[in-house]
Amino acid sequence: MKILSVRAVALPALLLPLVSAAPTAIAAEQTMVVTAAPSAVSELDTPAAVSVVNGDEMRQAAPRVNLSESLGAVPGLQVQNRQNYAQDLQLSIRGFGSRSTYGVRGLRIYVDGIPATMPDGQGQTSNIDIGSLDSLEVLRGPFSALYGNSSGGLINATSQTGAQPPTLEASSYYGSFGTWHYGMKATGAVGDGTHAGDVDYVVSTNRFTTHGSRDHSGARKNLANAKLGVRINDVSKLTLLFNSERQLSEQDDLSVMMYAGERETTQYQSIPRAPQLKPTHAGGVIDLTRHYQGIDTRWTHRGELLVPVTFTTGLDYETMSERRKGYENFVMNNGAPQYGEKGDLRRNERNLMWNLDPYLQTQWQLTEKLSLDAGVRYSSVWFDSNDYYITPGNGDDSGEASYHKWLPAGSLKYAVTDAWNVYVSAGRGFETPTINELSYRSGDQGGLNFGLQPSTNETVEIGSKARIGNGLLTAALFQTDTDNEIVVDASSGGRTSYKNAGKTRRQGMELGLDQQFGESWRLKAAWTWLDATYRTNVCDDASCKGNRIPGIARNMGYASFGYQPEKGWYAGSDIRYLSDIMANDENTAKAPSWTVVGLTTGYKWSYGKMDMDLFGRVDNLFDRRYAGSVIVNESNGRYYEPAPGRNYGIGLNLAWRFE
């Protein structure tokens, strides 16, 4: 059982406006703008591996509960639903994040500019409201390192902006395993957004409940998202999350963004009484409260220095304070343990983590066809722990650590034609242990794992992007060498300890296609080959050099084809493939490969000012039995988390326009 509450607010004064580049010679409605890249340009012109997923497409005939429903077409992204809503999705980009047993690790996540990743690198996707999402961008490769610590990849979610006419929407979905999801959303605007006093707004609320496909996997979640924008004058806009945009001049922009939040978690773990009685055991109940805040200031200048150039320099500061307690997950009743009750205190500590990162990014238009993007970030992370639970057999485990690293990245892009770009990029990444990874030492030892060191990686990538008719074809080859890779040491009874694994290598290839035929037919396809191996031995009893890194599929494939008119009947199908996944370092256990098929159909119509959408779907059409995810290096051999069999769902969406 887990109880989680999250509160966050951003308090910016001035937010950097998007720096638009010249569009390519294609229809505007076919251009997806990337804001997670070094500057806001089209997906075709971005000198990095990036994918943009439209929010309307993510909501099409979908439950709107998990990102795993709609991200299969993103190359290099392995997203698996654990069917365990206490642990969030298992999400990795090019193998980064695959070891996480809780939340999202090794990646940076932003929601409307607010980090959904804590300063220590631990993130979550459960706070992303699919119902009000405008777009979601996935940035892979060297440039993600410019976002600082734990940037093996970047996920940038952007909420919708209200527009005229005002609209009220209601959505509902019912599916197998007692699954319900329903929500309300109001959007609108006063004015056209270009004059002082103009206002836009989006307010979204929804509720999700399920009995779960496995025993004891029921869950419920309430989620709300609100966004309010106010045009202050012709060059300033205030967005209440809160974000504000101000252009100092035609050449200069200044941005200051502040945010703060709180997260509270209480989790009861199924651990027998005997292990909890050891003097160094932290108990079976985790009780923690986190307060986090940050500020990001940046200045952008556009001008000429022999050639057109854009400079962005800034300073990013983040801090987090955590109060972590542990209790026995039982009380004695008539001489017998009664589980599920908070017992005696077994852990009490206060952890502080903060980082301070200056950074510089530049863009040079060297010739009409050749451009250079380069940047550097100096990442400094400090960690301090104060132990307040000191007893005989459990000494003072207080300690501190600090980590520092230069993170350069660069990319050279050449426009072969107006519709075909090629690029080469390289960069260095840096990943410190999270507080969760420091929380436990191997062998039931007490105290924090200060022997765990940060990992560093170097990546090179070459890529190609081509506009083919009304479609986009992308390809990328990459290699990442990592030193001091952080991997799972042991996992048992809800406790996971970590260790450094020496050297690893990830090399692979990604292909992606998004092709539209005529006005209503759409084909999406993605394929990823990823060879992730240990280059040094990480096993105690045998040599693991050359073994595959567990938790990472070597091959992933996805294809979907659908008929999607604006009104009337629509239908689609998708097929997903995942090759086998090793479950331990020794490569003696693995989850077999699987292929599943899904179908959707629905009907859209309008009556006066009302738009309606009635749909149905079936997932895992052929009732394939497979492991949806694995728990890496689970000490008792319980590696596999089963996925649901064939399951069904129906939904109805209504929207009323106040015209």
Show which residues each predicted segment covers.
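Membrane-embedded beta-barrel scaffold of Gram-negative outer-membrane proteins
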Residues: 194, 253-271, 415, 421-427, ...
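Face-selective signature of the C-terminal outer-membrane beta-barrel domain
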Residues: 237-239, 243, 248-390, 415, ...
